[in-house]
From Swiss-Prot:
It holds the Pfam family DM. GO terms for biological process: regulation of DNA-templated transcription. It comes from Mus musculus. This is Doublesex- and mab-3-related transcription factor B1. Residues 348-359 have a biased composition (Polar residues). Its main location: nucleus. The gene is Dmrtb1. It comes from the Eukaryota. Belongs to the DMRT family. Disulfide bonds: none annotated.
Length: 359
């Protein structure tokens, strides 16, 4: 039983293959047309490249396993150039302190980011005091403790990194580390201008004759503070106190000297000239916005000429509607009066006539 093949080349050529057994037995590979020939050559080249890549990977794994990891040829030079400014090698090992021993393997050490307080701060010597670290040369080695003055001995304070730690073979001049003195506070001027709204008179400024009012000579580290005396409510209250604004009457000084422990020293109250002003009145409210103009009314179209109705007042008024007929006794009386002048007539027919008409 034959069927159409699944591969495109055989199907395009019109080949028919059996139901089973077509895998790997395509007939287009034996075709001599140009397209089939190019496809066959390309498949052969790709298979050869795959074999070469596999062999190269196996050889590289075998080489690394026998010789160990190696850096590229330019990697050591670049690493040494980049780390030469911030990395120093360890000194040579001296076994037993007798002469220089064999050169040990040099490892690179990166210094800490912050300035180091010195190796002697973290290690203790035989006497229990901070001594030289293991990175310094021994006592018998050149540049040891015997060749250095007592001023160089480590102190309990931060020190800059020493160049002899990185280069122990070079003898550098020994310089004593200066010891900074205690920090002295800088005194400030009394009553500096800090933007306060009050202005003091000349007698309220700190004077030279009163030692109690000169705190900066006794305590130079104190910050100038000018406390004010609160306004007593029992004294007279004026309009300013009624408004809720206390008026400044005087001031007192609090001594910061440790020798005066008797408490607060109050001074007689003196009147000060307040320089503050009453708050400005609130701004007037903005005027209301003007009302929008009414929309213009549309003009009515004129269907009649303007002089058409001017002659209507000359027309006579319409006559009133006729009144309905009414029969009353007054009408009969007038009629009787007119008939009496000609001749007398019997009253019964005259009286019956309106009755007949009404009937």
């Amino acid at each position: 039983m034959l069927r159409a093949p699944k591969c495109s080349r055989c199907r395009n050529h019109g080949y028919l293959v059996p139901v089973k057994g077509h895998t790997g037995k395509c007939r287009w590979k034996q075709c001599i047309c140009d397209k089939c020939y190019l496809i066959t050559e390309r498949q052969k080249i790709m298979a050869a490249q795959k074999v070469l890549r596999t062999q190269a990977a196996e050889e590289q794994v075998a080489t690394v396993g026998t010789q160990g990891p190696q850096l590229p040829p330019r990697a050591p030079a670049a690493a040494a150039t980049a780390l030469s400014s911030s990395i120093c090698p360890l000194p040579r090992a001296v076994p037993g302190g007798v002469g220089p021993g064999p050169t040990a393997t040099c490892f690179l050490e990166r210094p800490p980011q912050a300035p180091s307080p010195g190796p002697s701060t973290f290690q203790l010597g035989p006497s229990g005091r901070p001594g030289p670290s293991t990175f310094q040369p021994g006592p018998g080695a050149p540049g040891g403790l015997r060749d250095r003055s007592s001023a160089w001995l480590p102190q309990l304070m931060p020190q800059a990194p020493r160049p002899e730690l990185c280069y122990p073979d070079q003898h550098l001049p020994v310089r004593p580390v200066p010891v900074p003195g205690p920090v002295r506070p800088v005194p400030r001027l009394p009553f500096a201008d800090y933007g306060h709204p009050l202005r003091f008179k000349s007698d309220h400024v700190v004077g030279a004759g009163n030692p109690e009012r000169e705190p900066f000579k006794q305590c130079p580290a104190c910050v100038p503070v000018s406390p004010y005396q609160s306004f007593p409510l029992s004294e007279g209250q004026d309009s300013s106190s009624a408004l809720g604004v206390p008026q400044q009457r005087g001031f007192r000084h609090v001594s910061c000297s440790p020798y005066h422990r008797s408490g607060l020293v109050s001074e007689p109250a003196r009147d000060l000239q307040p320089t503050y002003c009453s708050p400005p009145p609130p701004p007037p409210p903005p005027p209301p916005p003007p009302l929008p103009a009414p929309p213009p009314q549309p003009q009515q179209p004129h269907f009649l000429p303007p002089g058409y109705l001017s002659a209507l007042h000359f027309l006579p008024p319409p006559p009133p509607p006729p009144s309905p007929p009414s029969f009353s006794l007054t009408y009969d009386t007038d009629k009787e009066n007119t008939n009496d002048q000609d001749a007398e007539a019997p009253t019964e027919p005259s009286q019956d006539s309106p009755q007949e008409q009404s009937n």
